From Swiss-Prot:
Subcellular location field: Secreted
Organism: Ophiophagus hannah
Family stated for the protein in its record: Belongs to the three-finger toxin family. Long-chain subfamily. Type II alpha-neurotoxin sub-subfamily.
Miscellaneous comment text of the record: OH-6A and OH-6B are disulfide isomers which arise from cis-trans isomerization of the Cys-47-Cys-51 disulfide bond. They differ in the retention time in reversed-phase column and the conformation.
Cited Pfam families: Toxin_cobra-type (PF21947)
Protein name, UniProt field: Alpha-elapitoxin-Oh2b
Lineage start: Eukaryota, Metazoa, Chordata, Craniata, Vertebrata
Length: 91
């Protein structure tokens, strides 16, 4: 009886698929585990009034789908852990 119960518990765990959660950067050095359903990491960059002297503004994060591209905004999306690093920190 114990063997049957143990087998059922193991099969339940295997069949439930405990789920994979993606990890994405949210800043230059910090990352976060994305919420369920958020399956892509993104890096959004754009110029503001100080772009010439300070460089582009950056926004990092998780999303369910790749954010919409608008004029003047560059977006990179990916789907592996920590795949959206700061451009200066890329290998």
């Amino acid at each position: 009886m114990k063997t049957l119960l143990l087998t059922l518990v193991v099969m339940t765990i295997v069949c439930l698929d405990l789920g994979y959660t993606l990890i994405c950067f949210i800043s230059s050095h910090d990352s976060v585990t994305c919420a369920p359903g958020e399956n892509v990491c993104f890096l959004k960059s754009w110029c503001d009034a100080w772009c010439g002297s300070r460089g582009k503004k950056l926004s990092f994060g998780c999303a369910a789908t790749c954010p919409k591209v608008n004029p003047g905004i560059d977006i990179e999306c990916c789907s592996t852990d920590n795949c959206n690093p700061h451009p200066k920190l890329r290998p």
